[in-house]
A protein has these predicted regions:
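Terminal membrane-proximal soluble interaction domains of membrane-associated proteins
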Residues: 6-110
Length: 110
C-alpha cells in the first residue's frame, strides 16, 4: 500500500560498522531516529537488507556511534545496489560512498 511505501522511503540510508575500525561496514536503513536503551547502552534500530532479496533482511539494534549517515543516497538507491548484487553501485565517490579501489585482481596474481 502507498502508506507503507512512503514509510520505507522516509528511512535514512546509513553505514553500520561491525567489529570496530578493522571490521566490516554494511549499508542499511535507519528505521527511526529514536534512540533505544538496550542493556544500558544507546542503540538505534536499523534494517539490514540482504541480497538479492532485500526484503528478507532483518532488524538490528546497533550502537549509536557505529552508525554513519550516507548523504545523497535514498532507500531506492540502496535497494538497487542490493537487488543487483552490487553491480549497480553509484559512480565513484557519489552518494557518500567510498571511492572504488583501482586495482586489477588478475594482474595482482601474476
Amino acid at each position: 500500500n502507498a502508506e507503507n511505501k512512503d514509510e520505507f522511503k522516509s528511512m535514512s540510508v546509513v553505514m553500520c560498522r561491525f567489529g570496530g575500525d578493522e571490521g566490516a561496514e554494511v549499508l542499511a536503513l535507519l528505521t527511526t531516529r529514536e534512540v533505544y536503551i538496550v542493556e544500558g547502552k544507546r542503540r538505534q534500530l536499523v534494517y539490514l537488507p540482504t541480497s538479492p532479496v532485500p526484503m528478507s533482511g532483518g532488524l538490528v539494534f546497533v550502537a549509536e556511534d557505529a552508525i554513519s549517515p550516507v548523504p545523497g543516497m535514498d532507500a531506492d538507491d540502496l535497494m538497487k545496489i542490493y537487488f543487483s548484487l552490487g553491480a549497480l553501485m553509484p559512480e565513484d565517490g557519489e552518494g557518500g560512498l567510498p571511492r572504488a579501489a583501482r586495482s586489477n585482481i588478475a594482474d595482482a596474481s601474476d
